[in-house]
Swiss-Prot record:
Region (Disordered), start-end ranges: 259-308, 610-689
Biased composition annotated in UniProt, kind: Basic and acidic residues: 610-626
Known role: Involved in spore wall assembly. May be a component of the mitochondrial RNase MRP (MtMRP), a ribonucleoprotein endoribonuclease involved in the cleaving RNA transcripts to generate primers for DNA replication in mitochondria.
Subunit structure: Component of the mitochondria-localized RNase mitochondrial RNA-processing (RNase MRP) composed of one single RNA encoded by the NME1 gene and at least 31 proteins. Absent in the nucleus-localized RNase MRP (NuMRP).
Compositional bias ranges of the Low complexity kind: 270-308
A Gene Ontology biological process term: sporulation resulting in formation of a cellular spore
Polar residues bias spans: 627-637, 655-670, 677-689
Keywords attached to this entry: Coiled coil, Mitochondrion, Ribonucleoprotein, Signal, Sporulation
Entry's Gene Ontology cellular component terms: mitochondrion; ribonucleoprotein complex
Signal peptide start-end: 1-18
Coiled coil: 406-435
Protein name per UniProt: Outer spore wall assembly protein SHE10
Entry's localization field: Mitochondrion
Amino acid sequence: MKILTKFFLLLVVTTCSLHYYCQIGQCSTQLQRVCHYTTPSVWDELLVEKNEFYREQLNPKVKVLKSHISQINSHYQDKVLPKLVDLGNRFYFDIVSPRIDNVCEFWEEFELKPYRERSLNQIRKVRQRIWFYYSVYLKPNLTKLDNQYALSDKYGKVHNKIAPFVAEIAQNFQNVYHQAAAKVHPHWENLRRTVNAKWEPISSSLWQRCRTNEICFKTNAQLKNIWKNLKLGCDYLSIYVHDALSPYSDGLESNVRATKAKSKSKPRVNASASARGNARAGAKAGAKAGTSEISASATADPTTSASATVTAGFEDDYDDEEPLYTSTSTIMLTVTMSTDQNELSPSQNTANAELGISEQDAIKDEFEAWFKVVDQKSSGVVKTFNKEVNKYLHHRVQQLDSIFQNKTKTVSEVLQNRYKNLNRAIQDINCTCETDTGAGNQTCFDSTGTTQLSEYITRSKMRELFAEAHSTLDQSMLQLKQDLEPIAQEVESRVSLIREEMVEVYEEWGDAMVSEWSKRLAYIDVVAGHLDDNGASTDEESSENWRKFLNLKKQVIKARDELAEHPADLHEIKQFVKKVHYLIEVLAKEAGEYLYILRARANLAFQAREQESKQREDSPRMDRDSTQNVENSNTTTASAEKSGKKAKKVKRVAQNGTNSTEKFSAGPDSSSKEPSMETTVQNNVTLQI
């Protein structure tokens, strides 16, 4: 769905763009046909004419829709558009126009000169810095490489091989460019005329309004002046770049001319050579004569002469049909000799050819920059050493941290296994044992009675397990401490190696800088002796330069000695070793405390088992004692019962005697005598028992 939506939007945008292009420009017949058949009104007319269903069913609704759209458009034109125009005018005149006036006033009062001077000063400083680094670092190294590997000869050979192909490619590209320009030019002209036809009324009205406004007119004049200055600055910059690159571009042009000359006929080569000979002869003659040529060059415009030189050189490279060598040599003479007549002298020209423009200032800048570089390097070599050591220590501490984490993890796992064995043995203390009467073997089970134990846990066995755990703990802690011992020696050897490498590099750098600048100072003294007429000032400057050079040389040696004797900061590795020792102590302390707790638990378990076994041994004796006690209690109970019965009989006899006495006292009769006799008989019997 997203793809269809994007395709539909692309189709709508393309169609609207084609319609707009056909309205404002002269499009081709095919585009006009496309625009015609993509217009909705055309399709409406065709469908009304040829489709009955559309004509009878849909066309009335389309007409109603068109009427609504026209009404909405009329309402928009009558009510909305005037308000929008009024709002836009008020926005422009109340907000935009005052801001433009303020900006124009600010620009009119703006002083460009300080910023221009500052930018030029910055450009000069950048140029001097680039020249210094080129003369100090690049030029000596490039010269050494060129002398060692003969790079100039190799470059010349490669260039001679590649130059014909490059020239051919450039010619083909130029032909293609001209052909494309010839094809594009008519379309470009049509587009330009169309744009001018549309834009000219607007631009003319804007220009009329700008001319009536004083601030706008002054701003336009200021912008024209700025554009003129920028163009002039670009021209001077191109002249400066061309003069700076002339030693390299001349060699390149000569190689290209040589490759072109090989591919062309000999008369043209002879003509070119003769033209160059005439140019050189004219230059030498002009340099020796020095009156008419120098006066003519003094009145010439530098910008015009330089531009003519560049144009002539370009035409000499790419258009050999026109012999412009004589004019080229004359113009080159004009640019080279365009100096003041009163200041020309052979010695000054020779010195300027050797040192270039403002060489004395460049030499001073080189001295200052070189002194600054050496000072920074000498003062920062110890900081660099500390930085390298800290970098190595940080990397090594990270490695050792991961290593010792793995080792402590391994030690913890070993100790955990020992703890598990001890806990299992402590649980197996409370076991149940059975003895086989036939074989005499003893079989033990755990507290649940489901798992058979391999052996019976005794106090001696538990002591062996605790001794093994303590031995494992001591060996692990000792191994960790032994692993820490070689780290200090390793770090010290590595730091010593870093120190030796940095000292060696610094010595090489110092030797190179000192030797190069000693040669440079000697060369400057020789050149300054030819340039300055005042020998005293030259000697003073030379002595001052050599004094500064000697001080910096001593500073280099002192910095080398400080680097060799500076103690390394090993705080990070010391903190790591201290942390590992603390971790070992904590681990050993915790393991010892936990083993002490396990020993106490084992002791309690043994005490409980011993008490239980003692109770088990004492239970038969207690059963015998309880049986005897029961028998004794039964005997006592029987005797008590007998004595009770006797007491009851005695009581009954006494009671019977009382009754008989009462009866006897009441009076004798026949009936009462018989019971008394029976009672007497019974009493006699009782007494006899």
